[in-house]
């Protein structure tokens, strides 16, 4: 297991390599700046030049990187990946960080599904506050997600090939295609004097996906007039987070 500084170097190097797949800039040319609460973004000149938005998250051995060709749209993008830890006592946390409607919906589920829903909601909430750039300065109880009308789809995840990276293993460049569970049509509401008030039309789009039984990811996009389209690629950087 590498220390935090080494892991951070790998993540930054990988981010630069991936961004260079989307624009004619070499990995060492990318320049970043940070929002008031620390959200990373491209410097203004490169944002205007490339039209790219990005956000990233990591958990365990997984790194999730979201990249969007936003063009001139002023959008907010946030992603999160979460591990459903069996050691977490979820119930004391509910009333501190979840909206009343989220708590009620979770507790109405069979007990064997409540832990999964907890981490589903946590991933969604993290993706939203990361999109806004407010981080934990925004109360997690001040907004809530509703999965009661979520639609299940499948999202193909293909193996990315041709990455010019020392971490990439060409030996795994086979016809691998995974079908991920993906949920769309997730509602988002905001607290209004102690109750949840639904905002219509909702300027936010969120989706929830599962990599496997233990890991799920969420993507939240704000400010776009177009439906969110996802293209999932699996990149195998040897020892990136090990």
Mark where each language-model region is:
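Core catalytic alpha/beta fold that binds nucleotide/phospho-ligands
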Residues: 1-242
